[in-house]
């Protein structure tokens, strides 16, 4: 992440068609920081900001896309186990829950672990990069930002302690993207900045 976001080295590094399988889950950024990538069960959600500052979010499999990523963190998970959640008040609260569940299951906490959540968001704020990173280029185009209330959706994340600047932002133990639905249709996707989850959300951890 440091190389891409802070140093501005945003060239294409990997073709998504070569990387994504039906069991892939992960997060990333499009080449040139043209947008955000969220991969859920082999489906690529690519969010981009249009010239008039609207958001488009496409939903494709690896074989259907010719997009490339400058930043991509994916894992292959064939089987998941589930945990029913109560109310989750914040992103940091979810981090605490995920950490406790991973420790309870004997995961190696020195290695990144993927997770996903099926949920109803009480509220959520996301952003999508707009051909620039405000860290490396504060005078560049502003990211698209969206706020939503009472929407169904998904979270896809990596829990990664000690990977600040590599897989997570400094000061965070996770890197989480969101897919926000409008009914059964994807409304938006992007990097999750903050959220609260209603009771009954389902946390998925690798089995």
Stretch-by-stretch model annotation:
Residues 131-182:
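Short, hydrophobic/π-rich interface segment
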Residues 2-22, 76-80, 91, 150-162:
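Extracellular/luminal recognition modules and glycoprotein regions
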Residues 179-207:
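C-terminal structured interaction module
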Residues 34, 112, 173-175:
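Extracellular structured ligand-interaction cores
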Residues 8-70:
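N-terminal low-complexity or amphipathic/hydrophobic leaders
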Residues 87-144:
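Mid-length scaffold segments of soluble, non-membrane domains
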Residues 48-109:
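Contiguous hydrophobic, core-forming segments of folded domains
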């Amino acid at each position: 992440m440091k190389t891409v976001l802070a140093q501005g080295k945003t060239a294409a590094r990997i073709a998504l068609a070569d990387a994504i399988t039906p069991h892939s889950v992960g997060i990333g950024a499009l080449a040139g920081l043209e947008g955000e990538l969220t991969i859920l069960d082999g489906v690529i959600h690519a969010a981009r900001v249009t010239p008039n500052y609207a958001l488009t979010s496409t939903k494709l499999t690896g074989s259907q896309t010719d997009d490339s990523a400058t930043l991509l963190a994916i894992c292959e998970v064939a089987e998941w186990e589930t945990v029913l959640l109560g109310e989750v008040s914040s992103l940091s609260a979810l981090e605490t829950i995920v950490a406790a569940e991973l420790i309870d299951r004997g995961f190696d906490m020195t290695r990144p672990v993927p997770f996903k959540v099926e949920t109803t968001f009480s509220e959520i704020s996301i952003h999508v990069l707009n051909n620039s990173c405000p860290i490396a280029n504060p005078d560049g185009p502003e990211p698209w930002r969206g706020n939503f209330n009472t929407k169904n959706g998904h979270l896809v994340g990596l829990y990664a302690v000690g990977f600040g600047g590599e897989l997570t932002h400094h000061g965070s133990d996770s890197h989480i993207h969101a897919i926000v639905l409008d009914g059964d249709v994807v409304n938006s996707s992007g990097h999750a900045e903050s959220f609260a989850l209603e009771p009954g959300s389902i946390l998925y951890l690798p089995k």
